[in-house]
Regions:
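Beta-propeller blade signature
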Residues: 1, 48-63, 102-113, 155-166, ...
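Short, conserved, GDST-rich strand-edge loop motifs in beta-rich repeat architectures
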Residues: 1, 10-11, 34-52, 89-103, ...
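Surface-exposed loop and turn segments in beta-propeller and other repeat-based domains
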Residues: 1-15, 67, 115-125, 164-186, ...
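Surface beta-strand/loop "capping" patches
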Residues: 182-183, 190-194, 253-298
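Blade-level signature of beta-propeller repeat domains, shared across WD40, Kelch, NHL, RCC1
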Residues: 220-265
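Loop/turn-rich, solvent-exposed surfaces of beta-rich toroidal or solenoidal domains
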Residues: 90, 130-227
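Conserved beta-propeller blade repeats
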Residues: 16-31, 73-88, 123-141, 181-198, ...
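Asp-box/WD-like beta-propeller blade repeats and closely related beta-sheet repeat scaffolds
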Residues: 1-47, 51-58, 62-77
Length: 309
């Protein structure tokens, strides 16, 4: 982005936020997924503060065909490509729900179709999952469990989407000594950041012995790179005493995920969207099974109108 073919366009005709493009991820079809403030919207709880939302976009590698592919309201972050070609990312979702608890994982096809809950959209603990990375040779992913009002540090977790899409069973704590910030407690020693899986049980990550910094507090400058395992081991790999170290990333080839052809019809902007619901009675909002088949007579569909920045 920012090349001669990028007009730095702001969607909706508004020019109230500086354009910021973050978190790029290479797509199997040659494009790049990233999050951007070009949507010119912001979360409703920010009360006039300059905190524009970053939503999922994509662009071709030559800078052409830059477009928004997710139309949420609050921030999205950390897109990564799954082994099946879909994109997994963090989405802050608070339509008709608590404003701070649901920053969880969604997935979408690279063209923006098929957006769905990947894990946690009806899960209250942890409050947020971020920095998701697929585990090599596995269908599982590793992520960072953190809070709403915190620097992006916390507990390393592993998620198995084949077990389920919500609640505790699909989630394994790799570093259980680190609490879920805000959801369980606010203080405690040590925290992790930027985990990168080598296997299902071995990870590179940044670690600090200092507590998780809350909103408005400066994180400690003592993060170093460690090798972490699922049995509680932590071995120092590299430390710089003058600055924190983050984002350890192995430089090696990996299998390319399949290219998912676009499912968008021609002139899609002029057509109604389609919502697929397989069985309304299979949901997380009736744990006791009190709703009987035949009771539901209608569905309510909300249209999300973004709040201008």
């Amino acid at each position: 982005t920012g090349t001669e073919v990028d007009p730095l366009e702001r969607w909706g005709g508004r020019m109230t936020s500086v354009i910021e493009d973050n978190d790029p991820a290479y797509l199997p079809d040659g494009g790049i997924a990233f999050v951007s403030t070009r949507c010119q919207s912001y979360g409703r709880c920010h009360n006039g503060r300059y905190t524009p939302s970053l939503l999922l976009h994509r662009v071709e590698r030559d800078g052409s065909r830059l477009r928004q592919i997710s139309f949420g309201e609050a921030n999205e972050a950390d897109p990564a490509v799954l082994p099946d070609g879909r994109v997994v990312y963090t989405r802050w979702e608070y339509v008709n729900r608590n404003v701070t608890k649901f920053h969880m994982l969604w997935s979408t096809r690279p063209d923006g179709t098929g957006a769905a809950n990947f894990y946690g959209n009806n899960t209250e603990r942890p409050w947020m999952l971020s920095e998701t990375v697929p585990i090599p040779g596995s269908h599982k992913v590793v992520a960072l469990a953190t809070g709403h009002h915190s620097f992006s540090t916390g507990c390393i977790v592993r998620i198995d989407p084949l077990i389920g899409q919500d609640e505790a069973p699909p989630l394994t704590r790799i570093t259980p000594e680190v609490a879920f910030f805000e959801a369980e407690r606010y203080t405690g020693g040590g925290c992790y950041s930027t985990p990168w899986p080598l296997t299902e049980d071995l990870f590179l990550a940044a670690w600090s012995p200092s507590p998780i910094p809350g909103q408005g507090k400066k994180p400690a400058d003592n993060y170093a790179i460690y090798l972490v395992d699922s049995l509680g081991g932590r071995e120092l790999i590299y430390r710089d005493t003058s600055v924190s170290c983050f984002s350890p990333t192995p430089v090696l080839p990996r299998p390319q995920p399949p290219v998912l052809g676009s499912a968008l019809p021609r002139q899609a902007a002029d057509l109604p969207s389609t919502l697929l619901l397989q069985d309304v009675y299979l949901n997380m909002n009736d744990p006791k099974g009190e709703i009987r088949r035949g009771d539901i007579q209608a569905l309510r569909v909300n249209q999300l109108i973004n709040q201008p920045a």
